[in-house]
């Protein structure tokens, strides 16, 4: 068999990877987890369980919903519909086809259902099975996720954002003293289920406990306890301890001495030992808990108390007459003076009372006695009356309602998470499968609430990440599915009851439209299903990792207070403290930290390295916020020696509550994996983040997401080392699926022969079709370009093509430019930016934007609209770009007003005059009237047509253009098929050749003789088809040839079949919206060069608008003649405190000067002045150990590497672990520059030096998506507002600029009366005046008269609504 590695080039593709000089000191033990796996795991693994066999599916997601809804039975229990299994068919169209045809990328869900029909004997009631029918039922199309974690809905890419919500369970809190005027803390508890009714328990100002269900009217908490079946005695016994007072003749009562119940106070009577009679402390002396413990230790068991001490205590059991056993007082009653006399008279020796003291208050006893309900029935009826006011309360209805509220699995679900949280908070041990409330839960919630009131325990922190969980895509859609299936269940039951069950089949019962509409509604309209932010790859990744507290079941902006929005200590390593929007959503929309992941319960986990006996191991453990509270966790930058031991006497550690403590090394449990785990992906791309103010860092991370992909990409010289990970995980770059060898490359596709062999030993072929000039959601350009050459050997997951904003597999959002910090004639006032003409001339910041325009030809009442070139009253000049069908050519340069697609619409006929009638009678029928309804280029748009798509309805004849596009597409499919076949044929026939050479022929084509031994030359004379006709002696060889032939034929057939399917799909016509016959989409690409008014920004929150483009000769320049590209204002720094940008500039300055140094060394090497050793020495000095892999290679590869860094050396300075000021100085020294990073600069206009040294360096700048071209517009005439008759505002309404109150003051100040008058009248809302003005302008006159503005009339009308009549009375003078 032929070796597949026979022509592998020595140099694998991984040698192309960019090497960065890394300033980080902390070794990474864990890689950054895939950045979009949150989305994919949640939907594909947990919800759909896509590629899992039916028998192996876990009971979660779709499986669990179907299991919980089915079986469905009809009311008489005759028919029973059960769920067997589900599976997905392959989607009809792939991702690309769906986006082009405006369809949803979805797969049909097929559910196998079994309908069992029973025969019921009416006399005995026994059931016998009558028949079973099993059938696969179509339940609608379920959207699938693309490989990048997005959904395609109606042709647009959308993302479902994960939601943060309060975890189900029980929460205890107080009102912080805000409700009652005295400032008393009122405690409350709330049970939040995953779905079902909320239960609240609360104290009022009088310390009585109430409960409410779903925030309805409140009832006494003891009513709830009675409703769950507790009697008065059980309630009192459960919540209180009791103590017995024994009568001691003539002395008082002896009672057990319990030191725990003693608080520090002065005694009102003597403390007497009841057993010995000794007085231990006199009245008026102070007793403390410490003293009490001492006496107890010395043997004090019982103390003597005065007779009247019992007054005010509460009975812990019924008080009975010893003689007659008659009940004298009920349990819980207070002992009064009268009752004490009765006790004395009847000589009752023992009285049991409740232990009520400052540590346990009488709240439940007081509530019991305030509550009128004395038994379970009354309590249930009371609850029924509150929840169903106006309905007659009977015990059955009340019991059923109460059961359904909290104890019925169909209506109440705590979820597994809720049960775990409930168990841990109430210290219970109930099985996790019990997801409804239990009697123990309710009893213990009241217990914990009372304990809180008594000062035991602490309230819950709602913003703690142990109490907030994340609902990802899978779970959100699961909830929608449940809603849809519950609705469907009702319709199934109706259909079962309505029809003849014997003849009905499962598909007759199921109406899938209900389910489909619910899912569709979620994806199209839900607040959490959002149009993907596709400005650049970083914005895509950030959008998928976003956590929103808003949305259904979440918070609303207006109600969210400061606490919810604030950073919480548990956010550490889970949620980024930096990246969040400015404005009303601040803190409600967050981003997940780089290393964070979500566990199966929906809590966010962060990774830590385990520390054993003060030794840091490489074991990485993920902890949630709750688990983390149990440990002491050190920082990632704790000093560690060579053996991995923590150095130093004390280590600074985080403990529960976000506090820091100093502990000895052996006490540390974990340390952070890396300092970068604190921040999000966007923030981790900012070098020197640690030197920036947090507000500016927030702006920096937000503005990186608005950077427009440029034509020429350029990775930052000063990066953080995360750039590669972002580019790879975003899906912008193309990754190799398997190891292989590049067979073909052009700008549109890459063909790779894989090295992973199939069972038959033949290679498979991977064809990567690259995206060329596609429009993103935000009209930026998606374009991929190959990085590989023919013959390259690629490994799985190598980057083989760059996408938008990526450079050699690293994210590249902007460009490196030479920046000087210096004021320049006021042109950089208020953060304005001054740029050199070179930037524009060399297209440094030029970007391509693509706009899509669509025209639909519909079938109207008067006849069909037609796409045509024959348009009435249009000059030939206007049609110059259209083909014979009336559609614009690709490559045409268009500007505003040009026709893109010619279209005519039938016009309703006007009444015919007698003359016309006569002419028609003579000259025959004239064609019906049509009006021009062509698609024109809107104002403000110009560019080149890059793509045209034509879609025709099924059954409508295709026009020439559609056929041409189709033909082009078929040729592309054929080329893919032929190339794949060619690679397989090459392999198969070279293998055949190896088998046949040296064999003896028994039979074969005419050219060969029987008995001959086969040689290579002989085979060269045969055609490929004749190889199969040869028969040889060796039976084993013949068997092998047979197998190869079979595999080859199968492969060929599969390829032909795939090709035929694609062609058939292409030719079959399209599913267009109702009434549409043809749809034409035209894409126009516009090149946006940088111009004044465009917004630019750095990565440190330093943003500004371009004020002027200066000729190169006028810009400041360096002593060697290099012209500065951009001049920034130094005043933008001190107040904003983003010093990171200065350090970046200095390191960038070192970068280009080091590159110059390397280039000089290479030049000298080529001139034979120095050897390769000097270059190696310099590279080691610069890069350290990173460079060893390069230095081991041949000399020419080292020189090739040096050429790659000739523009600038790339640095990585990781967040919080990067270069310090000294490192930057060292690099400047190594580059031969002044350590201050400042240089002498010459003014381009005068040719003189500036007075002071200027900070100059390479800085990474971004062009943001706020382009002046999209903002500026002008209005000539346009629409007016209906009521005020003033022009509308805004570009989209073609509106005017508002001349407001302050602007009027300005004209008043200058006394410009006539200008002011025309502003307020004819240019605004004087309707008659503006019509007359328009007339006079048309006639070429310049006079106008202004009348009364409409807003004055509106004001008069408003006065009239207040019954005030304003009249203008002219009095004669």
Curated annotation (Swiss-Prot):
<dbReference type="InterPro" id="IPR042107">
    <property type="entry name" value="DNA-dir_RNA_pol_bsu_ext_1_sf"/>
</dbReference>
<dbReference type="InterPro" id="IPR007644">
    <property type="entry name" value="RNA_pol_bsu_protrusion"/>
</dbReference>
<dbReference type="GO" id="GO:0006351">
    <property type="term" value="P:DNA-templated transcription"/>
</dbReference>
<comment type="similarity">
    <text>Belongs to the RNA polymerase beta chain family.</text>
</comment>
<dbReference type="InterPro" id="IPR037033">
    <property type="entry name" value="DNA-dir_RNAP_su2_hyb_sf"/>
</dbReference>
<dbReference type="GO" id="GO:0032549">
    <property type="term" value="F:ribonucleoside binding"/>
</dbReference>
<keyword id="KW-0240">DNA-directed RNA polymerase</keyword>
<dbReference type="InterPro" id="IPR014724">
    <property type="entry name" value="RNA_pol_RPB2_OB-fold"/>
</dbReference>
<dbReference type="GO" id="GO:0003899">
    <property type="term" value="F:DNA-directed RNA polymerase activity"/>
</dbReference>
<comment type="function">
    <text>DNA-dependent RNA polymerase catalyzes the transcription of DNA into RNA using the four ribonucleoside triphosphates as substrates.</text>
</comment>
<dbReference type="Pfam" id="PF04563">
    <property type="entry name" value="RNA_pol_Rpb2_1"/>
</dbReference>
<dbReference type="InterPro" id="IPR019462">
    <property type="entry name" value="DNA-dir_RNA_pol_bsu_external_1"/>
</dbReference>
<protein>
    <recommendedName>
        <fullName>DNA-directed RNA polymerase subunit beta</fullName>
        <ecNumber>2.7.7.6</ecNumber>
    </recommendedName>
</protein>
<dbReference type="InterPro" id="IPR010243">
    <property type="entry name" value="RNA_pol_bsu_bac"/>
</dbReference>
<dbReference type="Pfam" id="PF10385">
    <property type="entry name" value="RNA_pol_Rpb2_45"/>
</dbReference>
<dbReference type="InterPro" id="IPR007120">
    <property type="entry name" value="DNA-dir_RNAP_su2_dom"/>
</dbReference>
<dbReference type="InterPro" id="IPR007121">
    <property type="entry name" value="RNA_pol_bsu_CS"/>
</dbReference>
<keyword id="KW-0804">Transcription</keyword>
<dbReference type="GO" id="GO:0003677">
    <property type="term" value="F:DNA binding"/>
</dbReference>
<dbReference type="Pfam" id="PF04565">
    <property type="entry name" value="RNA_pol_Rpb2_3"/>
</dbReference>
<dbReference type="GO" id="GO:0000428">
    <property type="term" value="C:DNA-directed RNA polymerase complex"/>
</dbReference>
<dbReference type="InterPro" id="IPR007641">
    <property type="entry name" value="RNA_pol_Rpb2_7"/>
</dbReference>
<dbReference type="Pfam" id="PF00562">
    <property type="entry name" value="RNA_pol_Rpb2_6"/>
</dbReference>
<dbReference type="Pfam" id="PF04561">
    <property type="entry name" value="RNA_pol_Rpb2_2"/>
</dbReference>
<keyword id="KW-0548">Nucleotidyltransferase</keyword>
<dbReference type="InterPro" id="IPR007645">
    <property type="entry name" value="RNA_pol_Rpb2_3"/>
</dbReference>
<comment type="subunit">
    <text>The RNAP catalytic core consists of 2 alpha, 1 beta, 1 beta' and 1 omega subunit. When a sigma factor is associated with the core the holoenzyme is formed, which can initiate transcription.</text>
</comment>
<dbReference type="InterPro" id="IPR015712">
    <property type="entry name" value="DNA-dir_RNA_pol_su2"/>
</dbReference>
<keyword id="KW-0808">Transferase</keyword>
<dbReference type="Pfam" id="PF04560">
    <property type="entry name" value="RNA_pol_Rpb2_7"/>
</dbReference>
<dbReference type="InterPro" id="IPR007642">
    <property type="entry name" value="RNA_pol_Rpb2_2"/>
</dbReference>
């Amino acid at each position: 068999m032929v070796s597949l590695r026979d022509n592998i080039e020595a140099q694998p593709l991984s040698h192309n990877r960019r090497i960065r000089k890394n300033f980080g000191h902390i070794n990474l033990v864990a890689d950054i987890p895939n950045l979009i796996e949150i989305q994919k795991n949640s939907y594909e693994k947990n919800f759909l369980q896509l590629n899992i066999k039916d028998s192996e599916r876990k009971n979660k997601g779709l499986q669990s919903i179907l299991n919980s809804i089915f079986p469905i039975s009809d009311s008489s229990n005759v028919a029973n519909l059960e769920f067997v299994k589900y599976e997905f068919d392959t989607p009809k169209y792939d991702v690309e086809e769906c986006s082009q045809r405006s369809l949803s990328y979805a797969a049909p869900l097929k559910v196998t259902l079994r309908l069992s029909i029973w025969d019921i004997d009416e006399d005995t009631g026994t059931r016998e099975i009558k028949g079973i029918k099993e059938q696969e039922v179509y339940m609608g199309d379920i959207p699938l996720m693309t490989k990048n974690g997005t959904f395609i809905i109606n042709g647009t890419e959308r993302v479902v954002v994960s939601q943060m919500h309060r975890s189900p369970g029980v929460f205890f809190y107080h009102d912080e003293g805000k409700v009652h005027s005295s400032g008393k803390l009122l405690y409350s508890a709330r049970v939040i289920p995953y779905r079902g009714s909320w239960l609240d328990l609360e104290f009022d100002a009088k310390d009585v406990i109430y409960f409410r269900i779903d925030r309805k009217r409140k009832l006494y908490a003891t009513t709830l306890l009675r409703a769950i079946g507790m009697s008065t005695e059980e309630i009192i016994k459960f919540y209180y301890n009791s103590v017995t007072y024994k009568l001691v003749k003539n002395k008082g009562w002896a009672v057990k001495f319990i030191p725990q119940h003693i608080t520090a106070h002065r005694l009102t009577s003597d403390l007497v030992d009841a057993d010995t009679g000794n007085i231990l402390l006199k009245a008026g002396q102070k007793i403390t808990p410490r003293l009490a413990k001492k006496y107890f230790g010395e043997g004090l068991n019982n103390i003597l108390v005065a007779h009247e001490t019992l007054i005010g205590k509460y009975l812990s059991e019924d008080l009975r007459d010893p003689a007659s056993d008659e009940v004298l007082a009920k349990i819980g009653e207070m002992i009064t003076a009268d009752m004490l006399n009765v006790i004395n008279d009847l000589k009752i020796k023992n009285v049991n009372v409740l232990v009520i003291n400052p540590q346990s208050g009488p709240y439940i006893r007081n509530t019991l006695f305030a509550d009128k309900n004395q038994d379970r029935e009354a309590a249930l009826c009371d609850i029924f009356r509150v929840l169903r006011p106006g309905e007659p309360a009977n015990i059955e209805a009340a019991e059923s309602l109460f059961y359904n509220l909290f104890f019925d699995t169909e209506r109440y679900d705590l979820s597994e998470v809720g049960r775990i949280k409930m168990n841990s908070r109430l210290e219970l041990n109930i099985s996790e499968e019990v997801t409804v409330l239990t009697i123990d839960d309710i009893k213990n919630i009241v217990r914990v609430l009372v304990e809180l009131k008594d000062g035991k325990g602490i309230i819950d922190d709602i913003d703690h990440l142990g109490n907030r969980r994340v609902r990802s895509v899978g779970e959100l859609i699961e909830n929608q599915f449940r809603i849809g299936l519950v609705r469907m269940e009702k319709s199934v039951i109706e259909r079962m009851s309505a029809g003849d069950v014997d003849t009905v089949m499962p598909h007759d019962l199921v109406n899938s439209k209900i389910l489909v509409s619910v899912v569709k509604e979620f994806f199209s309209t839900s607040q959490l299903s959002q149009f993907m932010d596709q400005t650049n790859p970083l914005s895509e990744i950030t959008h998928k990792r976003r956590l929103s507290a808003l949305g259904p079941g979440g918070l609303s902006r207006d109600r969210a207070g400061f606490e919810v929005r604030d950073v919480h200590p548990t956010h550490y390593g889970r949620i980024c403290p930096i990246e969040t929007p400015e404005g009303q959503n601040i803190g409600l929309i967050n981003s997940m930290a780089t290393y964070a992941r979500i566990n199966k319960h929906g809590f966010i986990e962060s990774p830590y390295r385990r520390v054993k006996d003060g030794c840091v191991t490489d074991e990485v453990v993920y902890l949630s916020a709750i688990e983390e509270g149990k440990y002491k966790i050190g920082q990632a930058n704790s000093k560690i020696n060579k053996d991995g031991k923590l150095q130093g006497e004390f280590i600074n550690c985080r403990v529960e509550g976000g506090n820091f403590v100093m502990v000895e090394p052996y006490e540390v449990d974990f340390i952070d994996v890396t300092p970068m785990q604190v921040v999000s992906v966007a923030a981790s791309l900012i070098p020197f983040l640690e030197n920036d103010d947090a507000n500016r860092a927030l702006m920096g991370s937000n503005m990186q997401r608005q950077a427009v992909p440029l034509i020429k990409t350029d990775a930052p010289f000063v990066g953080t080392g995360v750039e590669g990970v972002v580019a790879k995980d975003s899906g912008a770059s193309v990754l190799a699926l398997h190891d292989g060898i590049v067979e073909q490359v052009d700008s549109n596709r890459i063909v790779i022969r894989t090295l992973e062999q199939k069972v038959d030993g033949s290679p498979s072929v991977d064809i990567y079709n690259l995206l060329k000039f596609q429009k993103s959601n935000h009209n930026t350009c998606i374009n991929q370009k190959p990085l590989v050459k023919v013959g390259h050997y690629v490994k799985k997951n190598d980057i083989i093509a760059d996408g938008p904003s990526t450079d050699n597999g690293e994210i590249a959002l902007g460009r490196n430019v030479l920046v000087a910090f210096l004021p320049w004639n006021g042109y950089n006032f208020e953060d304005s930016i001054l740029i050199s003409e070179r930037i524009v001339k060399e297209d440094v910041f030029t970007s391509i934007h693509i706009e899509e325009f669509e025209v639909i030809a519909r079938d109207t009442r008067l006849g069909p609209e037609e796409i045509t070139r024959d348009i009435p009253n249009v000059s030939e000049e206007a049609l110059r770009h259209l083909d014979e069908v009336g559609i614009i050519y690709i490559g045409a340069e268009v500007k505003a007003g040009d026709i893109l697609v010619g279209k005519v619409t039938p016009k309703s006929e006007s009444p015919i005059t007698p003359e016309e009638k006569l002419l028609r009678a003579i000259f025959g029928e004239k064609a019906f009237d049509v009006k021009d309804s062509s698609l024109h280029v809107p104002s403000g748009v110009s560019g080149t047509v890059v793509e045209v798509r034509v879609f025709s309805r099924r059954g409508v004849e295709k026009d020439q253009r559609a056929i041409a596009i189709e033909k082009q597409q078929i040729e592309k499919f054929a080329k893919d098929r032929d190339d794949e076949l060619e690679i397989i044929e090459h392999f198969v026939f070279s293998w055949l050749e190896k088998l046949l050479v040296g064999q003896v022929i028994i039979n074969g084509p005419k050219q060969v003789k029987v008995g001959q031994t086969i040689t290579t030359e002989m085979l060269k004379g045969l055609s490929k088809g004749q190889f199969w006709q040869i028969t040889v002696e060796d039976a084993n060889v013949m068997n092998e040839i047979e197998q190869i032939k079979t595999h080859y034929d199968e492969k060929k057939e599969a390829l032909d079949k795939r090709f035929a399917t694609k062609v058939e799909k292409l030719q079959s016509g399209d599913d267009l919206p109702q009434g549409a016959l043809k749809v034409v989409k035209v894409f126009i690409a516009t090149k946006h060069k940088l111009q004044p008014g465009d917004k630019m920004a750095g990565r440190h929150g330093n943003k500004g608008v371009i004020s002027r483009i200066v000729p190169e000769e006028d810009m400041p320049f360096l002593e060697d003649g290099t012209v500065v590209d951009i001049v920034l204002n130094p005043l933008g720094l001190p107040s904003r405190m983003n010093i990171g940008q200065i350090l970046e500039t200095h390191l960038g300055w070192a970068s280009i000067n080091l590159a110059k140094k390397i280039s000089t060394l290479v030049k000298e090497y080529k001139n034979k002045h120095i050897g390769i050793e000097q270059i190696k020495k310099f590279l080691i000095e610069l890069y350290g150990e990173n460079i060893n892999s390069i230095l081991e290679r041949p000399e020419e590869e080292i020189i090739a590497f040096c050429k790659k860094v000739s523009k600038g050396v790339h640095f990585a300075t990781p967040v919080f672990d990067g270069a310090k000021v000294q490192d930057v100085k060292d690099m400047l020294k190594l580059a031969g520059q002044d350590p201050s990073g400042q240089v002498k600069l010459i003014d381009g206009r005068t040719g003189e030096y500036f007075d002071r040294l200027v900070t100059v360096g390479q800085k990474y700048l971004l062009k943001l998506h706020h382009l002046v071209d999209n903002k500026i517009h002008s209005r000539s005439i346009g629409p007016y507002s209906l009521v005020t008759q003033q022009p509308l505002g805004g570009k989209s309404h073609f509106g005017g600029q508002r001349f407001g109150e302050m602007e009027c003051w300005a004209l008043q100040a200058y006394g410009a009366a006539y200008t002011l008058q025309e502003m307020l009248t004819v240019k605004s809302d004087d309707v008659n005046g503006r019509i007359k003005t328009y007339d006079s302008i048309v006639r070429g006159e310049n006079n106008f008269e202004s009348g009364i503005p409409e807003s004055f009339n509106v004001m008069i009308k408003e006065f009239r609504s207040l019954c005030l009549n304003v009249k203008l009375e002219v009095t004669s003078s």
